[in-house]
Amino acid sequence: MTRPTSSAPSQRMLRIGEQVRAAITQVLQRGEVRDDVIEATVISVSEVRMSPDLKIATAYVTPLGVSDHSIVIEALNRHARFIRGRLGPQLRQMKYMPEVRFRDDTSFDNYKKIDELLRSPEVSRDLDGDNDEQ
């Protein structure tokens, strides 16, 4: 049997990504990272995407209550090796502990823009016009 050639993540990648997300969230919630920026910010880890070989974990995070996300992302990336070390006890089943990279999650901003577009008068008028025809 041949492997599928699609670029969609495998079930294993999704499962491991969710486990890594939960482990990173626990490390951040416990306050194990000693950094003023990280300790003063509530950080939401929305998704972790694993590379196909499971050696790189890209964590998409949203710092809440901070206008400049780049400062928090830089602080997280500075402490990525420490966080990686703290993931070990929770991810014992993995042969290699993944390298963790933090990225800003812009999906909430994208959802907000789409919602604003759907609520705009032009789109509302078009949607109402579709209902009149039916």
Swiss-Prot record:
Top-level taxon in the UniProt lineage: Bacteria
Stored InterPro entries: KH_dom-like_a/b (IPR015946), RbfA (IPR000238), RbfA_dom_sf (IPR023799), Ribosome-bd_factorA_CS (IPR020053)
Record keywords, A-Z: Cytoplasm, Ribosome biogenesis
Locations listed in the record: Cytoplasm
GO CC terms, sorted: cytosol
Pfam families the UniProt entry points to: RBFA
Family label: Belongs to the RbfA family.
Quaternary assembly: Monomer. Binds 30S ribosomal subunits, but not 50S ribosomal subunits or 70S ribosomes.
The protein's name: Ribosome-binding factor A
